[in-house]
Amino acid sequence: MEYSTGQHLLTIPEIKRYILRNNFSNEEHIVTESMLRNAFKAEYTKIMSNRNEAWTVTDYYD
Protein backbone atom coordinates (compact mmCIF):
# COMPACT_ATOMS: atom_id res chain seq x y z
CA MET A 1 0.00 0.00 0.00
CA GLU A 2 1.35 3.43 -0.94
CA TYR A 3 1.00 5.71 2.09
CA SER A 4 2.24 8.88 0.40
CA THR A 5 -0.84 9.03 -1.86
CA GLY A 6 -3.40 8.92 0.95
CA GLN A 7 -4.96 5.75 -0.50
CA HIS A 8 -4.91 4.12 2.95
CA LEU A 9 -7.23 6.71 4.50
CA LEU A 10 -10.77 5.65 5.28
CA THR A 11 -13.59 8.15 5.14
CA ILE A 12 -17.15 8.10 6.37
CA PRO A 13 -20.00 10.31 5.21
CA GLU A 14 -20.72 13.27 7.45
CA ILE A 15 -24.11 13.36 9.12
CA LYS A 16 -25.83 16.66 8.43
CA ARG A 17 -26.56 18.62 11.58
CA TYR A 18 -28.88 21.50 12.35
CA ILE A 19 -29.25 24.17 15.00
CA LEU A 20 -32.67 23.88 16.63
CA ARG A 21 -33.63 27.14 18.31
CA ASN A 22 -36.51 27.69 20.71
CA ASN A 23 -37.88 31.11 19.76
CA PHE A 24 -39.31 31.75 23.22
CA SER A 25 -36.32 30.88 25.43
CA ASN A 26 -33.58 31.41 22.78
CA GLU A 27 -32.15 28.02 23.75
CA GLU A 28 -30.21 26.28 20.96
CA HIS A 29 -29.33 22.63 20.38
CA ILE A 30 -27.28 20.90 17.69
CA VAL A 31 -29.38 18.03 16.33
CA THR A 32 -29.55 15.57 13.45
CA GLU A 33 -32.47 15.02 11.10
CA SER A 34 -33.33 11.73 12.77
CA MET A 35 -33.42 13.44 16.18
CA LEU A 36 -35.86 16.02 14.78
CA ARG A 37 -38.06 13.33 13.21
CA ASN A 38 -38.20 11.35 16.47
CA ALA A 39 -38.88 14.38 18.64
CA PHE A 40 -41.50 16.16 16.54
CA LYS A 41 -43.22 13.37 14.55
CA ALA A 42 -46.12 15.08 12.70
CA GLU A 43 -44.71 18.60 13.24
CA TYR A 44 -41.39 17.68 11.59
CA THR A 45 -42.26 19.14 8.16
CA LYS A 46 -43.47 22.43 9.60
CA ILE A 47 -40.41 22.78 11.79
CA MET A 48 -37.96 21.99 8.97
CA SER A 49 -39.61 24.63 6.77
CA ASN A 50 -39.61 27.15 9.65
CA ARG A 51 -43.40 27.44 9.72
CA ASN A 52 -43.63 26.71 13.44
CA GLU A 53 -43.67 29.78 15.70
CA ALA A 54 -41.90 28.02 18.57
CA TRP A 55 -38.94 26.49 16.70
CA THR A 56 -36.44 27.59 14.04
CA VAL A 57 -34.03 25.24 12.27
CA THR A 58 -30.85 26.35 10.50
CA ASP A 59 -27.97 24.42 8.97
CA TYR A 60 -24.95 23.85 11.21
CA TYR A 61 -21.43 24.15 9.80
CA ASP A 62 -18.22 23.22 11.63
Curated annotation (Swiss-Prot):
May participate in replication-dependent transcriptional events during viral growth. Pfam families: Gp45_2. It comes from the Viruses. This is Protein gp45.2. InterPro entries: Gp45.2. It comes from Enterobacteria phage T4 (Bacteriophage T4).
